[in-house]
C-alpha cells in the first residue's frame, strides 16, 4: 500500500480549507484517508500561526513508516523543520526561450549594422 501525506480539500466554493492527511495514494483526493495529521487554511495571512497546523509527531511516525509527502506538503514540512530542504535545480529557467533568443540575435545584428554604418560615415 503506497501511502502519501497530502492535502484533502474542504470548505466551500472560493473558500478553500485543507486537511493534511495520511492516505493510500489510490484513494481520491478528498476521499477516504487513514489519519488526519493537520490543517492548512490558505485564506489566513502568511505570518499567522493558525495558517498551518501540523501534528509533528504523527507526521514523523508516518514518514518513518515510509509515507511519501506530496510536493506542497514537503515544502510545508521543510518550513516547519521536519525535513531537510531539498535543492531544486532548474538550469533552463534563467535562459530565454527560442523566440526571445531569435529577437536578441536580430537586435544584435541590427546594432552591429548600425555601428558599421556609423563608422563608415
Curated annotation (Swiss-Prot):
Question: Region (Disordered) spans which residues?
Answer: 80-121
Question: Which keywords accompany this UniProt record?
Answer: Ribonucleoprotein, Ribosomal protein
GO MF annotations for this entry?
structural constituent of ribosome
One GO biological process term: translation
Q: Which Pfam families match?
A: Ribosomal_S16 (PF00886)
Family to which this protein belongs: Belongs to the bacterial ribosomal protein bS16 family.
Keyword Flavoprotein in the entry? The reply is no
Q: What is this protein called?
A: Small ribosomal subunit protein bS16
Protein species of origin? Ruegeria sp. (strain TM1040)
What Gene3D superfamilies does this protein's entry cite? 3.30.1320.10
Per the record's keyword annotation, is Hydrolase included, yes or no?
no
GO CC annotation: cytoplasm; small ribosomal subunit
Cross-referenced InterPro entries: Ribosomal_bS16, Ribosomal_bS16_dom_sf
